[in-house]
């Protein structure tokens, strides 16, 4: 049995390196990534191709200046098939502003691949900073 923490760490290493092939291989064909909230990129994103091509690559490529994204992964905890990850993103936005947000995700691993991700972040900050949306009154 593959250690779920190792599966998620492999994905994170590929993410930092920009290794699209390994990123794609990290997900089960029927994986689901849910980003909660009302952002234009909120999901669920269903299936490996939708997660990688339509969400991770497309959104990242349009929201941030190329080459400006920096990741930090201070916490990675696993038990059974579940891994909890805390991560931070710093970047220059496509509009030229600074972005720094903290995230938490619950990853479920099945048969050596990521089968589910539930992602949480400060969506009001992301809406203002990435999409120019005013916070609700």
Residue ranges and their predicted role:
Residues 1-29, 132-137:
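Short, low-complexity N-terminal intrinsically disordered segments enriched in polar/charged residues
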Residues 6-16, 42-45, 61-64, 86:
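Short, mixed-charge, low-aromatic patches
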Residues 8-11, 23-24, 31, 47, ...:
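Hydrophobic pocket/interface hotspot
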Residues 22, 28-78:
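A solvent-exposed, acidic/Ser-Thr-rich amphipathic alpha-helical stretch
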Residues 3, 56-137:
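A beta-strand edge to alpha-helix "cap/lid" segment located at domain peripheries
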Residues 17, 36, 42, 46, ...:
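Short glycine-rich loop/turn motifs that provide flexible caps or phosphate-binding loops at active sites
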Residues 1-2, 17, 23-26, 44-45, ...:
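Alpha-helical interaction segments
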